[in-house]
From Swiss-Prot:
Its EC number is 6.3.4.20. Keywords: ATP-binding, Ligase, Metal-binding, Nucleotide-binding, Queuosine biosynthesis, Zinc. Pfam families: QueC. This is 7-cyano-7-deazaguanine synthase. The lineage of its organism: Bacteria, Pseudomonadati, Pseudomonadota, Gammaproteobacteria, Pasteurellales. Belongs to the QueC family. Its cofactor is Zn(2+). Binds 1 zinc ion per subunit. It catalyses: 7-carboxy-7-deazaguanine + NH4(+) + ATP = 7-cyano-7-deazaguanine + ADP + phosphate + H2O + H(+). Zn(2+) binds at C194, C202, C205, C208.
């Protein structure tokens, strides 16, 4: 897995939630661009658990990365979703999108990230969306990202480059990438992925299951290679 492609003459902004995927992307960006050329942008969209924002803030402070927090909580007033409703039960009905899907969220995040990036003279926008393990989320697909990239370039007459380093990686391969970057233990300990907002994860929600299954698979594969 090619993770080091020095690009220290450019700057990049990472859409950062404090979860496993965006934290892995943040570390890869630091390796590629240099810490001094990286910024993080985090969105307060009305998520049901404050721990997400707390983890994101703690990680960027620990790493010495500039973070910009954008309030997009108006989303909570115009769409209903289990990730923004503390009383909602997380579920997925057959042949339907899971109720954790937030309509328009990634489109909005990319739009705001692009507006901010252009103001800072930054062209590269990094996001941790992934098509391989995606839970049916249409805005995690490569075709959406490519379309959004073209749209933003046309809308602002600016050459953005939306990068998705995890797009075709399984969750096990994402853990492998973190390990190759030397931060597997850090990602495992400091990131938050749980839909239920439980420190260390509930182990039962779809996000925890995917995360834990991927880690177990990677560690098993790694153990076999080391035998």
């Amino acid at each position: 897995m090619n993770i080091f492609n020095p690009n220290h003459d450019r700057k990049a902004i990472v859409i950062f939630s404090g979860g496993q995927d965006s934290t892995t992307c943040l570390f890869q960006a630091i390796a590629e661009y240099g810490k001094e050329n990286i910024e993080a942008i985090t969105f307060q969209y009305g998520q049901r658990h404050a721990i997400e924002l707390e983890k994101a803030r703690a990680i960027v402070q620990d790493l010495g990365i500039k973070q910009t927090l954008i309030d997009t909580s108006v989303m909570k007033a115009i769409t209903h979703n289990a990730l923004m409703d503390e009383q909602a039960h997380i579920e997925q009905k057959e042949n339907e999108l899971p109720n954790t899907f937030v309509d328009g969220r990634n489109a909005l995040f990319l739009l705001y990230a692009a507006i901010y990036a252009k103001g800072q003279g930054i062209q590269d926008i990094i996001t941790g969306v992934c098509e391989t393990d995606f839970s049916g989320y249409p805005d995690c697909r490569d075709v959406f990202i490519k379309s959004m990239n073209v749209t933003l370039n046309l809308a602002m007459d600016y050459q953005f480059n939306i990068k998705t380093p995890l797009m075709y990686l399984t969750k096990a391969q994402t853990w492998q990438l973190a390990d190759e970057l030397g931060v597997l233990n850090y990602v495992q300990k400091h990131t938050h992925t749980c839909y239920e907002g439980i420190e260390g994860g509930c182990g039962k929600c779809p996000s925890c299951i995917l995360r834990n299954k991927g880690l177990k698979k990677y560690l098993t594969q790694k153990g076999r290679k080391n035998v």
